[in-house]
């Protein structure tokens, strides 16, 4: 068969498998690629190839993740699977592999377990809004009522963490049976059902270019006779020459200006879009009124804040993190986008200290405001070395 050309015509969605250890996340990943390979939508990836996930470094944290890709009739998917529980925690908090939706794998024989709960909680904290459930190992359960019971438990658990449990698609099957009976349409039907549920239930994410414009300021310089230029990489949205923008962060007040010119690689552009590295010429802004760490953004789209609650993973000693615990009132630097800001932390009630390797919710108060929104990632640093990684879960003020 001639190789098909990769078509960009299909919308792209990032998903991943989550759930308790040994409930069959990796087996399911292998089963999906195997079934879709027969339709020409993937190359079959064996369990062992997925399980020996390569180590990746994301912000200095070692995470094992496996990436596979496949497509259905409607979409192209990038799918991430992590071998160990700690890898999931790190992956979800650092956003190393962004997930637009997740497949929660629960063993029908065992029902929800501690990590099932923990992964649902993490998904809700880090902004994974859509979950589709696969009840695996159904071949090990003789009584259909038991499967219904597990289904009810899973729906209740999803409701508990703010997901619409009653409306969540749940597909029942056995990933191992699929792998052992690849040519038996009856046995592989559960994968077709799962992919249909994912196609219809997890919406196509809004592309970065459709979101409101935002660019973190990396550097500032003056062009004699023309004015002040801010450089940086456009994080989201589109900027046109003549657009009004706000300058936000590092001080309480927000200043407004107009972008009078855009340059990229010394060429003049009419518009810049997400992903472009640009210089933006700003009308009426003095060199000392703008600094690294601020952002340029569409007016009204983002606001500066000092207080927030974050979900944080604290690096282990082996990952280059601290060797000792920290306590209430700890004052490290919080690195948002392009700059460090000092902040003090408040631990949850009943938590005396935080050990390297822990993940925890903490309340933070920064000394200067930063342009922030929920789900924004940050690093915690001490003297320039990363000791933690986090995501903003709620903004306090």
Curated annotation (Swiss-Prot):
Source superkingdom: Bacteria
Source species of the chain: Clostridium botulinum (strain Hall / ATCC 3502 / NCTC 13319 / Type A)
Localization (cell): Cytoplasm
Region annotated G3, chain positions: 81-84
GO CC annotations, alphabetized: cytoplasm
Protein family (similarity comment): Belongs to the TRAFAC class translation factor GTPase superfamily. Classic translation factor GTPase family. EF-Tu/EF-1A subfamily.
Stored PROSITE patterns: G_TR_1, G_TR_2
Reactions listed under catalytic activity: GTP + H2O = GDP + phosphate + H(+)
Entry protein name: Elongation factor Tu
Function: GTP hydrolase that promotes the GTP-dependent binding of aminoacyl-tRNA to the A-site of ribosomes during protein biosynthesis.
Region (G4): 136-139
Gene that encodes the chain: tuf1
Annotated region described as G2, given as residue ranges: 60-64
HAMAP family associated with the record: EF_Tu_B (MF_00118_B)
Stretches assigned to the tr-type G domain: 10-206
Top-rank EC class of the record's enzyme: hydrolase
Segments of this protein annotated with the region G1: 19-26
């Amino acid at each position: 068969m001639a190789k098909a050309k990769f078509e960009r015509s299909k919308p792209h969605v990032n998903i991943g498998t989550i759930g308790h250890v040994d409930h069959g996340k990796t087996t399911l990943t292998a089963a999906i690629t195997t079934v879709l390979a027969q339709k020409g939508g993937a190359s079959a990836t064996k369990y062992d190839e997925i399980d020996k996930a390569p180590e990746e470094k994301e912000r200095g944290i070692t995470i094992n993740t496996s990436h596979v890709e496949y497509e259905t009739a409607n979409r192209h998917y990038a799918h991430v699977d992590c071998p160990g529980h700690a890898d999931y925690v790190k992956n979800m908090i650092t956003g190393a592999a962004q997930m637009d939706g997740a497949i929660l794998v629960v063993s029908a024989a065992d029902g929800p377990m501690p990590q099932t709960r923990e992964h649902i909680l993490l998904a809700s904290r880090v902004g994974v809004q859509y979950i589709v459930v696969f009840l695996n190992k159904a071949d090990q359960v003789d009584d259909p009522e038991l499967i219904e019971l597990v289904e009810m438990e899973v729906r209740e658990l999803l409701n508990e963490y703010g997901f619409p449990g009653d409306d969540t698609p749940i597909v029942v099957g056995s990933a191992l049976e699929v792998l052992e009976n690849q040519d038996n349409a009856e046995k592989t039907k559960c994968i077709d059902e799962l992919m249909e549920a994912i196609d219809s239930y997890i919406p196509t994410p809004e592309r970065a270019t459709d979101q409101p414009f935002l660019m973190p300021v990396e550097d500032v310089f003056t062009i004699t006779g023309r004015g002040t230029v801010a450089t940086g990489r456009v994080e989201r949205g589109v900027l046109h020459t003549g657009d009004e923008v706000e300058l936000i962060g590092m001080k309480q007040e927000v200043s407004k200006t107009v972008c009078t010119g855009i340059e990229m690689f010394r060429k003049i552009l009419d518009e810049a879009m997400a992903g472009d590295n640009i210089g933006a010429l700003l009308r009426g802004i003095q060199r000392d009124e703008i600094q690294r760490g601020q952002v340029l953004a569409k007016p009204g789209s983002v606001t500066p804040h000092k207080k927030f609650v974050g979900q944080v993973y604290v690096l282990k000693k082996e990952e280059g993190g601290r060797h000792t615990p920290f306590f209430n009132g700890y004052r490290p630097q919080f690195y948002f986008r392009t700059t460090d800001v000092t902040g003090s932390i408040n631990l949850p009630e009943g938590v005396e200290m935080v050990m390297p390797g822990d993940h925890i919710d903490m309340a933070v108060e920064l000394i200067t405001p930063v342009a922030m929104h929920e789900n924004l990632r940050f690093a915690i640093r001490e003297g320039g070395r990363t000791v933690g990684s986090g995501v903003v879960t709620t903004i306090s003020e």
